[in-house]
Amino acid sequence: MGHVGVATATDIRDLVLRAREAQQRWKRSSFGDRARIIKRFHDLILERRDRVLDTIQSETGKSRRDALAEIVIVAGTARYYLANGERHLALKRRRAAVPLITSAEIVYKPHGVVGLITPWNYPFLLGIADALPALLAGNAVVTKPSELTPLSAVLARDLLVESGLDPNLALIVNGSGDTGAELIRHVDYIGFTGGTVTGRKVAITASERLIPYSLELGGKNPMVVLRGAPLAEAATGLLAGAFSNSGQTCISIERVYVEEAVYDQFAKQLAEKTSRLKLGWSKAWDVDMGSLISKAHADKVSSRIQQAVDAGARVLAGGKRRPDLGPSFVEPTVLTNVSDAMPISKEETFGPVVALYPVRSSEEAIARANDSEFGLNASVWAGTGTEAREIARRIDTGSAVINSTLLIYNSFDVPQGGVKYSGIGRRHGEHGILRYTQAQSIVSSIASGGGFDALLNRIRNERMARAVVAGLKVWRRIPWLR
């Protein structure tokens, strides 16, 4: 497909300096000027979609549909922040110490140079979608894509530049983990998407410099299916939730807790639907699931399946390698009889594998869903919307989806991120653009008599102090002054 050069420490330092210089001009531009470039970029990725799709598929081995999902979400992200970004960034007025004589406002200033370290599973989407709100907020962006999939990020950046962006405002540094570590030493903010182990290292390096950061890390995401739920729809939803992008999605479902009364029926439907999925690498739209990212990752996923089977797990569907299709293909797999002692029940597999667990009640389902060091996403299917919402609110995850599985990532007006070992910070919504800014509070007082502080300094005796206390008691009872 091509090749990219590996950035040295000197290269990274020099590129960040170039970005910093360009950002000084960019931050003075209007939101409208920035938005015009992002709008052209939105239109351009749709116009060049075949080239984008071909690049994504060639780097990752994913299906055409999964590649299209990357374009759809990037376009949706652009549209959302084009429509709402200026409002999120606008000056906000707040109450100050004393009405009438004091006032307060919040202004949002760009950090400067934002660094993004992005993974291989969605190389176009994650290579550019987080950069869009950062740019609209007035930052420059330097991205370090995965060494397994650098060309999708390079293409995204090239399309941004073709849309009119100063080339020094969106730069790419290629290399391994050491490249990312060096990038953190120079930027003003770092956003990382990837595994929990590496995320901890990112947090330590960023903390040493006292720069802000966000981490979207791993997940062992649960799904709850209760009696009264639409079982056929839940099984179909799980196909997407567990096997989209060959299961290589941070928010994908890996654990399913099914109420005993409907367990057998649900398991049968899921196994039948899973066995009908079409595997392959093709530009045709009828392929349901592509390959894993590499033979090494396929080896890891297959080993995890075999380890579970050797320990007593039962395969309801899939479970096999497909060397006839290529070295990186693993069938979409449904497991039962998985015990809590098996690593596959606790550790993220990041592949097309889902395990079913019977539960006696919704209380047991909630308890087992929460029995994880991760807390990224969850899915709930119940008899009524009220019941589903009550359960969703009790699951310890950054997001919970009712009657769907991956819907959170297309819901651009709400924050998306994790709790516990699944990360810190949020993308999307107001949070997704304000994280790229520093909030500055500006408070003011009338100058008469030396200002508000001087008024307090005029308290000279107990009678004056009692008068102040009495005034505070009255103040609490006046709603518009609280």
Mark where each language-model region is.
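Residue-level signal for inorganic ion chemistry
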Residues: R34, I56, A78, G138, ...
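Conserved C-terminal structural/oligomerization subdomain of aldehyde/semialdehyde dehydrogenase
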Residues: M1-V4, K278, R322, F329-R482
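N-terminal Rossmann-like NAD(P)+-binding subdomain of aldehyde/semialdehyde dehydrogenases
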Residues: M1-S103
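ALDH superfamily catalytic-core signature
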Residues: Y189, V197-S339, I402, M464-A465, ...
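Structural signal for hydrophobic packing residues in well-ordered secondary-structure cores
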Residues: Q23, K27, H42-I45, R49, ...
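Rossmann-like NAD(P) dinucleotide-binding subdomain of oxidoreductase/dehydrogenase enzymes
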Residues: R94-E233, V359
